[in-house]
Curated annotation (Swiss-Prot):
NCBIfam families reported in the protein's UniProt record: PRK11062.1
InterPro entries the UniProt entry points to: LysR_subst-bd, Tscrpt_reg_HTH_LysR, WH-like_DNA-bd_sf, WH_DNA-bd_sf
DNA-binding span(s): 21-40
Alphabetical keyword list: Activator, Cytoplasm, DNA-binding, Transcription, Transcription regulation
One GO process term, biological-process aspect: regulation of DNA-templated transcription initiation
Highest classification ranks of the organism: Bacteria, Pseudomonadati, Pseudomonadota, Gammaproteobacteria, Vibrionales
Record has Phosphoprotein as a keyword: no
Family matches, as Pfam families: HTH_1, LysR_substrate
UniProt-recorded name of the protein: Transcriptional activator protein NhaR
Organism: Vibrio cholerae serotype O1 (strain ATCC 39315 / El Tor Inaba N16961)
Amino acid sequence: MSHLNYNHLYYFWMVCKQGSVTKAADALFLTPQTVTGQIKALEDRLDGKLTKRNGRSIEPTELGQLVFKYADRMFGLSYEMLDIVNYSQRSNLLFDVGVADALSKRLVSKILLTSVPGDNRIHLRCFESTHEMLLEQLAQHKLDMILSDCPVDSSQSPGLFSKKLGESRMSFFSFGDVDFAPFPAVLQSKKLLVPGSRTAMGRKVRQWFDRQGLQPHILGEFDDSALMKAFAIYHSDAVFMAPSFYVSEVDAESSLKLIGHVDEIKEEYYVIFAERMIQHPAVKNVCDADFTNLFL
């Protein structure tokens, strides 16, 4: 049996990972026709059909699933090899981290500090996006690690792992005058700034409103927690939701006032990484760190 053309195998692997020829072609900087031709050559070599159409997506046939399983292990090992070579040869380790935009930037910053080794041999690059987009980039080996507000579903994303780092209670704050009314009923008379409905925290908040029988006036929804706080500074009549550790600013920053705590709602923090990154020194630092004193 003659040797396999690994370029053909790689293009097939990318199509399976991306779910379509067009997306794979974009990722490979090739035309869809070129990718299709390469997969056809692989099918001729293996004497069998590797893909089939399912609506607008491409999925592997039974033979394709078998080939993809081995290809996934092969190319996963190749990326792992490159990472290990990179660790041993670079004076500064390049470490690309994706951060879910819904998370508190202050807490994220403190978590990231633990990723930096004592000798500072690291070149940290941070990128913000949604949980879903970051997972896609991690699966494509464009990121080394993710900090997010929800774990990864290993059944949907094989080869990816998550570890819970901690959770923070949530509270409502305002930069304006505070009414001495019972909480949470006081929220009915306020303009609220809350996390976006597509975020994990946004869904938790709305469920809590329903349980409390509240129908508040929502002035704005924000996926970015830092932007929500900045907006609240310039709209002092609004009330915004943030991790409870913000209460430490109430004394130091006199204009910030606590409206009330919500013990039932917790903002969770997870680190997500690929199996090949387990030995990365920065990932190990984060996974091994004790964040007990960081979260309220």
